[in-house]
Regions:
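Short coil/turn motifs that cap or connect alpha-helices
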Residues: 84-86, 90, 259, 272, ...
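Hydrophobic alpha-helical transmembrane segments of multi-pass inner-membrane transport and secretion
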Residues: 225-261, 289-290, 294, 331-334
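Mid-to-C-terminal secondary-structure elements
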Residues: 20-225, 231
């Protein structure tokens, strides 16, 4: 469960009051019966994070400065959200403002900036401070913090201890974001949302709590626009498939009809019925095959466009490509074969007399 509250208030504009609230509220959350772990984070998975400029001090792209997702967290954040650590350690209560600045980065960040091996122990530079990478976490999906639109994805993300977050940056983040109080329970408990609100209210009765949500609710909200876009795209795709089928049927049928008279003459001169049917069908099916080949080549470019807008679209989907190609090929075969039955009714003598 996730509770959200605004900290965009003057009384939390200094580090001492901010950290005191986090520590006391997390302790209150942990006191709720059935709670396994509790933590606070600026954002949670599926949400847009703060965009922040970070320079890589060493690694594959040493010296490069880029904007990435930044999330401040308290200890147990990864445990509460069940985000596995792939390397190194998590952030702990020992990571204070007076200790070495540290961070956990996700696999997407490590792969892009630090290289695939020995990422733990590398260093980042931010606001004149050197930050040591102490852990690599698994990726979670989220919108990019510095783009509008596009699908949620595994964006490069840096997680830093809330105690080491610069106060000015914390205050700026609270203008745009409502921090999240996260708990993980041993099972489903009735009234857990009310207990979370009571725990926060016990620490600060004036804390403006905007709501309590399940992670499934946050995921649904994050994917709402994606669902609308996917439904619209599916409808348009079905319409395009229908129009393609009608077009292929009409084109192939027309090609066959145009050659009916010619084939009647060929039959009068000794061509067999089977040979005439093959001759008239071949051109239409060949034209369809050429069109399918061109469509398959263009599909790779179309997939890249769709992937830039929708989450979870596979780069290669041979099953769908084969199914659509087979359907259109079947339409072409039917369109080519049906008119050929007229050939069987052609009287070669009548055709010669007409000529």
């Amino acid at each position: 469960m996730v509770a959200k509250a605004s900290l965009d208030e003057a009384r939390y504009n200094n580090q001492a009051s901010f950290l005191k609230l986090l520590e006391e509220s997390v302790a209150a959350m942990q006191g709720i019966p059935g709670v396994q772990s509790a933590a606070v984070g600026l954002t949670v998975p599926y949400e847009r994070a703060l965009n922040y400029s970070v320079k890589v001090a060493d690694g594959r792209q040493a010296g490069e400065q880029d904007i990435t997702n930044l999330v401040y967290v308290t200890p147990a954040y990864f445990e509460a959200l069940q985000i596995p650590l792939r390397e190194g350690r998590s952030l702990t209560v020992g990571d204070r403002s007076t200790s070495q600045y540290v961070a956990v980065v996700n696999q997407a960040f490590a792969r892009k900036y630090l290289g695939r091996e020995n990422s733990v122990g590398r260093h980042l530079l931010s606001d004149g401070s050197t930050i040591e990478v102490v852990g690599i976490s698994a990726n979670v999906i989220a919108p990019s913090g510095f783009t509008q639109g596009g699908p949620i994805a595994a964006e490069p993300t840096v997680y830093v201890p809330a105690a080491q977050m610069p106060t000015q940056l914390v205050n700026l983040a609270h203008v745009w974001f409502q921090p999240s109080w996260i708990i993980r329970t041993k099972g489903k408990f009735a009234g857990i949302a009310q207990q979370m609100q009571q725990a926060l209210g016990g620490v600060d009765p004036d804390l403006p709590i905007s709501g309590v949500y399940g992670m499934t609710d946050l995921l649904s909200d994050a994917l709402l626009l994606q669902h609308i876009e996917a439904s619209l795209l599916a409808t348009l795709s079905a319409l395009a498939l229908l129009l393609s089928s009608v077009g292929i049927y009409g084109l192939v049928s027309n090609l066959v009809n145009q050659r009916t008279r010619e084939l009647g003459i060929r039959m009068a001169l000794g061509c067999t019925l089977q040979g005439a049917m093959f001759e008239v069908s071949r051109a239409g099916i060949a034209a369809t095959g050429a069109g399918l080949a061109g469509g398959l080549l263009l599909s790779s470019a179309a997939v890249k466009i769709v992937r830039s807008q929708l989450f979870g679209v596979a780069l290669y989907d041979p099953l769908t490509l084969c199914a659509v190609s087979a359907f259109l090929a079947l339409v072409a075969v039917v369109a080519a074969v049906l008119p050929t039955f007229r050939i069987a009714k052609i009287d070669p003598a009548e055709t010669l007399r007409a000529q």
